[in-house]
C-alpha cells in the first residue's frame, strides 16, 4: 500500500510536539536541552527518510491542508497538557517565585513555546467547524494565555499584548459596524493596553532592565570594532567579558558593577550574530523571519498560520535568545519549507532528489548518534571526577573529539584540578583561553596558579575575574590568599578592607565564610 502523502510531516509534527516539552533527561551534562536537540535531529532525519520512501513510491505532494491542520492540532494538544501540568504544580506547590516553568528549564523557554503555539491554536479556532471544537480550542487558548502570564516573562507579555490587539480588532470588526465607533473603541483600548504593557515591562524588573542596557552597550562596542566581518565564530564568547572588564577598570564606581555577571549572550539574537559574523548575518536573519509576511503580501494566503509565530520569534530575538531552543528552529524550518513549497515540488521531480535526501538523513542520524555517545561519555567522566582518578583517563579519551569545545575544556581542567593534577589542569585551562574569556575560567586559572605557587600569574587571573564581575567575593578571597602566602601585608590589609566594606548582592553562606576568613 503506498505511503500516505502527508505521513512524513505528520510524523515529524507529532514527534516534535512531544519532544519540545520533554522534562530533563539526566544522561548528558546538559539534561534539559541536549536530549531535545538530539531527538529533534533524529526526528527530522527519520522524516527525511520517510519522505524519500514516499518519493520512491511516486508520492510527491507532501504539503496539503490536512498536514497543516494536523501540525496545529498536535502542538495545541501537547501545549494544553503542558499548561495543565503547570496548573497541577501550582495546586500542589503554590506559585513559583521566579515564574512558572512546567517541564522546561526556565520561564523564558516556556513563554517562547506558548507564544509560538498560540497562533496555531487561534488559527484552529477561526477555521474549525463545529461549536464543540471551537469551545475546545478557545479553552486551550485561554489556558495558554493565563499560563503565559504566570511565567512572568516580559517578552511573553509583549507577545500576549500583540495577540490581544489582533484579537480585539477581529472582534470589533465583526460586531461593531459604525466605523467611527469601531475605531474609537479600538484606538482607546490599544493605547491603554500598550501603555500598561510598556509600564509593566519597564518597571517590573528595573535591575534587569538596567543590566540589559549595559550588556547592549558593551555588545555594540564589539560591533563597532568589526561591523562588516564580525569577530568570527563564537566571537562574543571570546571578547565580551574582556570589554566588560575594561569598562569596570575605567569606571570602578559604576552603578552597573553590582549587576554585572558572567554573560554569554547579549539577549539579542541580531546583535549576537552581528558580533560573530558581521552585518550580513542580522540582515539575513531579519529577512528569514519576514519571509512568511513577504509571501503573504504577495497573495499567498496559506502562509497566514505562520505570520504570528514568526513575528513572535522576531520579538523574542530582540530581547532574548530563542534560537537556543529547538522550537524556534522548527518554526523557521516549517515556515520556510511551506514558503518555498512550489520550488520544492519542482525538485521532487528529479530522480536524484530522493537519493540525496536519504543520504542526508542517514548522515544526520550518524552524526547525532556519534555526538550523543560522546556527550554521554563526558557526562560519565564528569560524574566520576568527584570520586575517581580514572575520570581523567575518560576525559583524555574524549579530548580529541571535544578539543574545540570551551565548556568541555573548562570541565576537563576543573576535573584535573579536583584530582590534584595541577600540571594537566594548567595546560587545559590555557587551551580554553583563546576560545572563551569568562569569569569562571579566570577564577579557575587563578586557583590553579595559586596552588602551583605561580603567584604573579594567579594575581593576574584573580584581578581579571574581579574586573569582569566586581560584585563577586571569590576573586578577592583568591587575592587575599596570594598576598597571605607571599607575606605582602600591605596588599593583604587592602583586600581585607575591600571585603569588609563591599556591598553584598546575595548574602550566601560563601560570602559569610569569606568575610569571616578575611578579617
PLM segments and residue spans:
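Hydrophobic alpha-helical transmembrane segments in integral membrane proteins
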Residues: 197-211, 359-390, 407
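Short coil turns that delineate tetratricopeptide repeat
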Residues: 403-404, 436-437, 470, 504
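Alpha-helical transmembrane segments of multi-pass inner-membrane proteins
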Residues: 10-29, 36, 40-60, 66-97, ...
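Alpha-solenoid helical repeat scaffolds
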Residues: 376, 407-411, 440-445, 473-478, ...
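Interfacial juxtamembrane loops and adjacent helix segments
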Residues: 233-276
Amino acid at each position: 500500500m503506498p505511503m500516505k502523502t502527508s505521513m512524513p510531516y505528520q510524523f515529524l509534527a507529532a514527534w516534535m510536539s512531544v519532544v519540545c516539552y520533554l522534562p530533563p533527561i539526566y544522561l548528558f551534562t546538559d539534561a534539559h536541552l541536549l536530549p531535545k536537540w538530539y531527538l529533534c535531529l533524529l526526528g527530522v532525519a527519520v522524516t527525511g527518510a520517510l519522505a524519500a520512501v514516499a518519493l520512491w513510491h511516486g508520492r510527491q505532494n507532501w504539503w496539503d491542508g490536512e498536514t497543516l491542520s494536523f501540525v496545529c492540532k498536535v502542538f495545541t494538544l501537547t501545549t494544553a497538557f503542558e499548561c495543565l501540568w503547570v496548573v497541577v504544580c501550582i495546586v500542589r506547590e503554590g506559585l513559583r517565585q521566579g515564574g512558572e516553568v512546567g517541564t522546561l528549564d526556565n520561564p523564558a523557554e516556556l513563554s517562547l513555546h506558548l507564544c509560538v503555539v498560540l497562533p496555531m491554536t487561534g488559527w484552529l479556532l477561526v477555521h474549525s467547524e463545529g461549536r464543540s471544537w471551537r469551545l475546545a480550542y478557545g479553552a486551550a487558548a485561554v489556558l495558554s494565555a493565563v499560563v503565559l502570564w504566570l511565567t512572568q516573562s516580559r517578552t511573553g507579555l509583549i507577545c500576549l499584548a500583540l495577540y490581544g490587539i489582533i484579537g480585539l480588532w477581529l472582534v470589533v470588526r465583526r460586531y461593531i459596524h459604525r466605523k467611527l465607533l469601531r475605531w474609537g473603541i479600538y484606538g482607546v483600548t490599544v493605547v491603554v493596553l500598550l501603555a500598561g504593557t510598556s509600564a509593566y515591562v519597564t518597571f517590573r524588573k528595573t535591575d534587569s532592565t538596567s543590566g540589559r542596557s549595559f550588556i547592549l552597550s558593551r555588545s555594540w562596542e564589539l560591533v563597532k570594532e568589526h561591523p562588516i566581518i564580525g569577530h568570527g565564530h563564537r566571537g562574543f564568547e571570546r571578547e565580551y567579558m574582556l570589554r566588560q572588564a575594561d569598562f569596570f577598570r575605567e569606571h570602578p564606581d559604576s552603578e552597573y558593577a553590582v549587576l554585572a555577571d558572567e554573560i554569554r549572550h547579549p539577549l539579542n539574537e541580531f546583535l549576537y550574530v552581528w558580533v560573530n559574523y558581521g552585518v550580513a548575518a542580522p540582515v539575513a536573519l531579519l529577512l528569514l523571519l519576514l519571509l512568511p509576511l513577504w509571501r503573504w503580501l504577495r497573495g499567498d494566503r496559506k502562509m497566514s498560520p505562520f505570520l504570528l509565530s514568526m513575528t513572535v520569534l522576531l520579538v523574542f530575538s530582540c530581547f532574548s535568545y530563542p534560537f537556543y531552543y529547538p522550537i524556534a528552529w522548527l518554526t523557521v524550518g516549517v515556515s520556510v519549507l511551506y514558503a518555498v513549497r512550489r520550488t520544492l515540488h519542482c525538485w521532487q521531480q528529479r530522480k536524484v532528489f530522493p537519493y540525496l535526501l536519504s543520504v542526508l538523513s542517514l548522515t544526520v542520524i550518524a552524526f547525532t548518534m556519534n555526538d550523543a555517545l560522546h556527550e554521554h561519555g563526558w557526562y560519565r567522566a564528569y560524574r566520576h571526577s568527584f570520586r575517581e582518578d580514572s575520570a581523567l583517563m575518560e576525559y583524555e579519551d574524549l579530548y580529541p573529539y571535544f578539543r574545540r569545545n570551551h565548556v568541555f575544556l573548562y570541565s576537563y581542567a576543573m576535573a584535573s584540578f579536583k584530582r590534584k593534577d595541577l600540571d594537566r589542569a594548567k595546560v587545559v585551562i590555557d587551551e580554553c583561553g583563546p576560545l572563551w574569556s569568562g569569569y569562571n575560567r579566570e577564577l579557575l586559572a587563578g586557583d590553579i596558579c595559586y596552588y602551583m605557587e605561580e603567584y604573579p600569574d594567579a594575581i593576574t587571573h584573580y584581578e581579571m575575574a574581579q574586573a569582569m564581575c566586581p560584585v563577586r567575593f571569590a576573586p578577592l578571597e583568591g587575592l587575599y590568599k596570594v598576598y597571605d602566602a607571599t607575606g605582602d601585608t600591605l596588599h593583604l590589609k587592602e583586600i581585607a578592607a575591600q571585603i569588609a566594606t563591599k556591598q553584598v548582592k546575595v548574602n550566601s553562606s560563601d560570602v559569610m565564610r569569606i568575610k569571616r576568613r578575611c578579617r
